[in-house]
């Protein structure tokens, strides 16, 4: 758990934050090992803090959570996906349905057909290799959908690059690039925590989106990781998505839980957040309708 600090409680639609209200919160983000726990967490004393923010709390632990008369709001429910390829790449592929395997093979072939018959992916892990990865990946990231639309591209500042080299020196990082005709078109960045690969950054050249370069690189990365055998569990972290579901071998039902002191201001804040989150959830379910088009328009 972190020390109490100002934390923005966001009213967010898609990638756009419409409003932020700050509270001093003690934060706890559950990693994959913690998410597999069967006992509710022991929360630190609030002292001067306004409350807690618990991310990736297993839903099975919600009922046993010590609420201590606090106001509780679940901001989102989701499955925390992971992939285990410790049995080798062939066993990993065999865990999928025939339809999924056919889909992946079709995407590989489509990319290969448009890249002179090759699927060229490279793994980077030493400090020297990571320096080369950064040189190639940063310009690619800045042209990616993830950077342009979501603001979630690969960090390019000096501190982030120093952290990458430090992780690589400790053998705590795996990074990948996918090339098309000698040009990088997708990147994947996986730091390691407690022996588990963390799905941190995936991006691709938006001009190549029709070739599914992110999917192709993810599959090739898992192939290389399974062959290496050093790290064989990939944590897709909090939040859902078709990409995560596609490559996962399992998942844990989790929730992001906000707990606040029962003040009038906090009651009004949580009431507004519940109403807003409900509208966003219902709008998301209207996929393909006018309501969903409204949500997408906020992301442009």
Model-predicted segments: where are they?
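A conserved beta-strand-loop-helix scaffold within acyl/acetyltransferase catalytic domains
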Residues: 1-23, 57-210
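Conserved acetyl-CoA-binding loop-helix of GNAT-fold acetyltransferases
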Residues: 38-42, 210-223
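Short glycine/serine- and small hydrophobic-enriched flexible loop segments
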Residues: 47, 165-166, 220-227
